[in-house]
Structure formats: structure tokens, C-alpha cells
Design a protein with these regions (language model features):
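Metal-dependent peptidase/peptidase-like ectodomains
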Residues: 1, 39, 101-195
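Soluble metallo-hydrolase cores and metallopeptidase-like ectodomains found primarily
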Residues: 1-67, 83-90
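Second-shell loop/turn segments in exported
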Residues: 17-21, 59-71, 140-148, 171-177
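Beta-strand segments within the central parallel beta-sheet cores of soluble alpha/beta enzyme folds
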Residues: 44-47, 93-102, 127-130
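Active-site alpha-helical elements of protease catalytic centers
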Residues: 67-81
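C-terminal soluble interaction/assembly domains
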Residues: 77, 81-82, 86-91, 108, ...
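A fold-wide structural signal in alpha/beta-hydrolase
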Residues: 78, 95-97, 193
Length: 195
């Protein structure tokens, strides 16, 4: 921390030997859908991962890392969306898919698997809407979008926000690159509009 600090090269080497074992584990993605009433080849995916970090260093004796905002709220959101879509008298034209992938916290492995083994044609996905880390600050009128400006869906969102008296809040931490670090990104890499 001193402004006078200057690194020096020690010209030394270190040899490390390590023995490691691992167990192969399986963890499922969870998916449900409501069939579309029209072009049932096309789908809209609502996405929210179900995993969290699990356990870590204890805080006040509790080592459980609770995942209420990341990402249990997204699961509640998807269940409510499914209930609302199912209650509609006139069903949407497209299939409405609810995908809750596993292992987002370890590199969105569940989503990567899904885009390589889709249950609905990957080239017929019209949009992917991802909810990750939902703030629980009470009612507000803003819609904060991670990576706003990077999605083909931005204009559609802007129209809807205006229609419902909401305003769009661009990603306040865009420098963190969160657009590239959540479950919608494997879909983006396949050319699918996602946010």
C-alpha cells in the first residue's frame, strides 16, 4: 500500500504436487410448459435457476448460504407466471416454457446442457426472459435490466414499460459484466433474443 513499494524478482521456482479426487454428480433441470394456441413450434422461455451456493463460512454460527434473492424469488415468480398464463381464457399463440436450470452458480451448466439438448426447437425460441437476483425492496416503478442495450428485446421492453408507467433503469453495475454471467447468456450465444 506504500507508494514507495517496488516489486523485485526473486528468481526462484516452486514445485507443487497435488492429489485430487472427485465424484461425478447429477443435478436436474426442471421444466414445464403451457402449450400455445397457435404456432406451437415457437416458444417463449421464462428462466430462473433453482440452485444457490449451499454452505460457506459460518456467519453467527450459521453456515447456510440462503438464496432468497438469488434465486428463490425467481422460482416463485415463475410459478405465479405459470398460474396466470394458465388462467387466461385466451391462451398465448406460442408455447410458454418455464425452465429452471441447475448449476447456474457453477457456470450455468444446466442452461448450457439445455441449449445443446433442447426439448423445444432451439431455432424456434422467440425470446428468453431470465430473472436472476430479484431485489426485495418493496414496490417501485423501475425495471432494472442487466446488460440493457445488449438485447434485441430492449425496444419491446421499452414499449411495455411506457405502456405500464414503468421506467427502465440501465444496469447500475454494467462494468461487472453480469450480462455475460447469467443463464440467459448460453441462449444469446445461440443467437436467441434474451434478457
Amino acid at each position: 500500500k506504500s507508494p514507495d513499494f517496488k516489486p523485485i524478482c526473486l528468481k526462484s521456482t516452486v514445485t507443487v504436487s497435488m492429489r485430487n479426487t472427485f465424484d461425478r454428480q447429477q443435478s436436474p433441470n426442471v421444466i414445464g410448459y403451457i402449450p400455445g394456441s397457435g404456432n406451437t413450434d415457437e416458444s417463449v422461455i421464462y428462466l430462473g435457476h433453482w440452485d444457490h451456493l449451499g454452505y460457506g463460512a459460518p456467519i453467527n454460527g450459521d453456515s447456510t448460504i440462503n438464496g432468497a434473492t438469488d434465486n428463490a424469488v425467481a422460482i416463485a415468480w415463475m410459478l405465479e407466471m405459470a398460474r396466470c398464463f394458465n388462467a387466461l381464457k385466451e391462451k398465448p399463440r406460442r408455447n410458454i416454457v418455464f425452465l429452471s436450470p441447475t448449476c447456474e452458480e457453477t457456470g450455468f451448466l444446466g442452461t448450457k446442457y439445455y441449449v445443446e439438448h433442447p426439448l423445444f426447437p432451439i431455432d424456434k425460441i422467440a425470446a428468453v426472459i431470465n430473472l436472476d437476483v430479484f431485489p426485495l425492496w418493496g414496490e417501485n416503478n423501475d425495471v432494472t435490466i442487466t446488460g440493457y442495450g445488449n438485447s434485441e428485446l430492449d425496444d419491446t421492453l421499452a414499449e411495455l414499460a411506457k405502456k405500464y408507467n414503468r421506467y427502465i433503469m440501465p444496469d447500475p453495475d454494467a462494468y461487472n459484466g453480469m450480462f455475460y454471467r447469467s443463464d440467459h447468456f448460453p441462449f444469446v450465444q445461440k443467437g436467441i433474443p434474451a434478457m
